[in-house]
């Protein structure tokens, strides 16, 4: 509590991550017999009674998202669209990855033998290598993507040696009539669906 109190209201996002990491370390210590008792960094039933909720400390801004109940219909509509931006959007939704991770995806990261997409640490927000399973639907999408000469990218842009612009998917959403949602909002759509 003494570690978190000074930063809880000043830098709530960082404080929340620090609390989470402390909780994980103490849980691991308990699991390996290095400590006993309750975890003092646990949020539910402990710190939630001692510290204000993050929503009370700072305004959390959510990205406008598609309701999960409309996702199936949207995916069918998306499949009918032509162009790389739509395929990039489809891959973003299928993998729950960030826009930058999908647009920066390179053929060298894709292993269709093991059905794994390995995103290198330097392209991840958390600076850790991330492995994404390639589902049958994603594999089909990847197999249909055109290979552009001398481009390492799955979704090459107009400028030589550059990936597709990060605005391309958002513009695709707008052309489809979905200007009220964002690409990043699909991560929230997935979270809501998984929570049901």
Give, region by region, the residue ranges found by the protein language model.
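Active-site/catalytic core of tyrosine-dependent DNA strand-transfer enzymes
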Residues: 11, 25, 65-72, 114, ...
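A short, basic/aromatic helix-end/turn motif that makes direct DNA contacts
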Residues: 104-110, 195-196
């Amino acid at each position: 509590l003494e570690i978190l109190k000074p930063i809880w209201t000043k830098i709530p996002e960082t404080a929340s991550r620090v609390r989470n990491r402390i909780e994980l370390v103490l849980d691991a210590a308990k699991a390996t017999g290095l400590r006993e008792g309750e975890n003092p960094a646990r949020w539910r039933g402990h710190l939630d009674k001692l510290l204000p909720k993050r929503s009370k400390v700072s305004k959390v801004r959510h990205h406008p998202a598609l309701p999960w109940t409309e996702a199936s219909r949207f995916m069918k509509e998306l499949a009918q669209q032509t162009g790389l931006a739509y395929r990039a959007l489809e891959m973003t939704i299928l993998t729950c990855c960030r826009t930058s991770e999908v647009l920066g995806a390179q053929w060298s990261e894709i292993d269709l033998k093991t059905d794994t997409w390995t995103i290198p640490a330097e392209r991840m927000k958390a600076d850790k290598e991330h492995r994404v399973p390639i589902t049958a639907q994603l594999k089909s999408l990847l197999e249909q993507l055109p290979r552009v000469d001398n481009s390492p990218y799955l979704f090459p842009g107009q400028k030589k040696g550059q990936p597709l612009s990060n605005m391309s998917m958002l513009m695709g959403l707008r052309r489809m009539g979905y200007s009220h949602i964002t690409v990043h909002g699909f991560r929230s759509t997935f979270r809501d669906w998984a929570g049901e």
